[in-house]
């Protein structure tokens, strides 16, 4: 399937160090396509009992210590070529390799810092822009000229805000799961253009009917830094996105989710598109805290156009994983 999509697919023996090294080298050398490395592995590889009987491919070795599964730790270490008396021993030749690599990387870092220093001195305006992008902050904006219809739908108000941002926030990227004309992320698209093969000059990503993939890509953008990702779809499809949304909250990523059509009044689609219970699930995620004890998520459900504008202000200005419904 991935080969049919145009990916660079490499299949290897996941226990062969040389094959792993060659696959990673080939992946780094590939400049045009994404790479998928498939490592075929055996569960409990090398695990044996005291009498030498194999514990490979046994489900019991998963999710508990080998000894609890019935294998013998010392016998397994010996079977894998290690020293059962000192199982965490670092061989001298391995230590030398890591020492040499440490020095190589230190030199590389020194070189990169010199290059950055030179670039910044020669490109002062771009340097300031880069710092702004990486800070996660946005330019100061005057919302007074933003026109919102007083009795319009909140998603229509959201479209107006997105159009406003498209002209003022250079590093914001908006995505939609094949619903931009319905979730009204097209307010952003109308002021830019979608990515296409060989052309990434726009600021809109048409993700297709792939909600989880879209959410994961948004997480990746946030982890890389320098851009503000937002993605939209119907609220009922948040179920497909949930693993990525939860991880975004735990990782304290500044990702904005735009979920529309959030009640039983969603037109002719019927019960399959009526997210009656979903808000309770998402609201519970507000209780997630990161390792610093900080709340990682803010859930916003604006009732009218004015609240929608305020919700977007919070979404843009706060460094939280934000849900804008």
Residue ranges and their predicted role:
Residues 1-95, 270, 278, 284, ...:
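Glycine-rich ThDP/TPP pyrophosphate-binding loop and its adjacent helix/strand module
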Residues 11, 95-96, 100-323:
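Thiamine diphosphate
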